[in-house]
UniProtKB/Swiss-Prot annotation:
Annotated ranges, domain SCP: 80-200
Signal peptide: 1-19
Pfam families, per the entry: CAP
Recorded superkingdom: Eukaryota
Lineage of the species this protein comes from: Eukaryota, Viridiplantae, Streptophyta, Embryophyta, Tracheophyta
Family: Belongs to the CRISP family.
Protein name listed in UniProt: STS14 protein
Entry-linked Gene3D superfamilies: CAP (3.40.33.10)
The Sequence repeat ranges on this chain: 13-14, 15-16, 17-18
Keyword Repeat attributed: yes
Keywords assigned: Repeat, Signal
Function of the protein: May protect the outer tissues of the pistil from pathogen attack.
Amino acid sequence: MFVLSTAMACLVYIYIYIYDEEKKRELKVRNKMTNLLFFQFLLLTTASSLTHISAQTVPPPPPPPTSAATPPSRAAQEFLDAHNKARSEVGVGPLTWSPMLAKETSLLVRYQRDKQNCSFANLSNGKYGGNQLWASGTVVTPRMAVDSWVAEKKFYNYENNSCTGDDKCGVYTQIVWKKSIELGCAQRTCYEGPATLTVCFYNPPGNVIGEKPY
């Protein structure tokens, strides 16, 4: 179509050129008009072609799919299930696993094993709530560690929000603390003897003085 239009414009141009020599002035005017019309037609044809090409532009590729969050490991899931079982028994919502807290506890337990002879860490000034367990003579699974903390439930008196007698129950109240929503835990086997050190962190921390856990 573009070639045909160009040829037609050239024929008009030649016809005007061989017109009467006495009308050179008229010829000159017509010649300019013809060139102008041809130029306008060329612009329209080019614009039409560009519009056609633009309409066929290939759309951008779709964004790459986002990867799903990595599920907790088997040990992490065992820690989580044992905690949430105890929380559900008193009507408290479940905790979620925090890779950040898990990393913090892993670094701490490794340090306590390598530098502190597998002793308890000082958690009194930490920004998270914390529970610890040291056990020897057997392999301690995550569920066994949590169950030993939950066993302190029998010492907790909800009515007056205190532990009975001289017994301790703070590790249990931290487990069921309603405002704590994230959990991270780690375990290490001690070098001397069959012993295991377990640490769990809770965020936000629980056991706030004057408040009930739930």
